[in-house]
């Protein structure tokens, strides 16, 4: 019965059209690879895999919609398990009611969440529950936590990574105790934050790195921040990254979108929408980068840039919810609790705001001069005006009726 359900769902999810050899898109083959986890089989399964992916779910209800939603999640996991079958990654489901004791032991407390066990670490996946996103996330997770830079061409590739937090350190060798501490620190943040290292003096010179020094790069910033007081312990590196992991300007990414959205400041986000591939969107993004660089020392400023191309399924929802047109650049302040929002007036694509105008608008947001509560008040005022109009219309009708009665007399 399970396979029959999965095949039905798979027909809707995946195209079965034939393609030329070399471009055969994976379709679910009907083999069950995702198993139910229990206290009895937990240790056996844990020993079998280097990485264990666990979907912690509420008991499946009798509601047909809930059942279909569960089956959709199940087929996504089955497809991911099929694609990564050769990678020694296990996939299991944990029923919150049947396996409550095991879930408590593992520290699971949020139904509908996906957890990954790697060694003694538990990583919660806080991104889009889609097969392609999950595959990329898990492949990043099984790689070494630190990528080694050995040449000037690799330095160029490193420098082109601008929308991620990244760290790079210079060490004597892979056997160095300080490199080991760096590697251990990297495991705490894998795969969300990228760690790089070099043992090459030429590479270190090009990056202005001294022996045992680590530079911290905030997204979209021109210059790195050297971490003070080298050499560092693992704990010191972890503490520094945690204190600086909310950038001034960051990109909303499918692999950690919910974690980013929950990391708000006082319940709000400053949200620009801009397509990087579009000329106007690219220009607007460059202006935003300039504003972020000029205000990188402001701890109260956090801007979450969204490229609509990254989230095609959400474009219509955002346009309806925020009442904006995402075919042109936008910037607004969004209340994460109720999605109330206020958006900067941008007349047209040919008249984008300058960096100074954006800074003034952002200052008004941070000071509270512009806020989503004002938008609520305006809506209430509009409703009151409409009520007054209705009252006036009602009174006019009564007066007309009175006049008619007098005429009849």
From Swiss-Prot:
Disulfide bonds: none annotated. Its main location: other. Gene3D superfamilies: Glutaredoxin. One of its GO terms (cellular component) is sarcoplasmic reticulum. Residues 373-409 have a biased composition (Acidic residues). It comes from the Eukaryota. One of its GO terms (biological process) is regulation of cardiac muscle contraction by regulation of the release of sequestered calcium ion. Keywords: Calcium, Glycoprotein, Metal-binding, Muscle protein, Phosphoprotein, Sarcoplasmic reticulum, Signal. InterPro entries: Calsequestrin, Calsequestrin_C, Calsequestrin_CS, Calsequestrin_middle_dom, Calsequestrin_N, Thioredoxin-like_sf. The modification Phosphotyrosine is found at residue 282. GO terms for molecular function: calcium ion binding. Detected in heart muscle (at protein level). It is found in: Sarcoplasmic reticulum lumen. Glycans are attached at residue 335. It holds the Pfam family Calsequestrin. Residues 364-409 are annotated as: Disordered. Residues 1-19 form the signal peptide. Phosphorylation in the C-terminus, probably by CK2, moderately increases calcium buffering capacity. N-glycosylated. The keyword Manganese does not apply. Belongs to the calsequestrin family. Monomer, homodimer and homooligomer. Mostly monomeric in the absence of calcium. Forms higher oligomers in a calcium-dependent manner. Dimers associate to form tetramers, that then form linear homomer chains. Interacts with ASPH and TRDN. PANTHER family: CALSEQUESTRIN, CALSEQUESTRIN-2. Calsequestrin is a high-capacity, moderate affinity, calcium-binding protein and thus acts as an internal calcium store in muscle. Calcium ions are bound by clusters of acidic residues at the protein surface, especially at the interface between subunits. Can bind around 60 Ca(2+) ions. Regulates the release of lumenal Ca(2+) via the calcium release channel RYR2; this plays an important role in triggering muscle contraction. Plays a role in excitation-contraction coupling in the heart and in regulating the rate of heart beats. This is Calsequestrin-2.
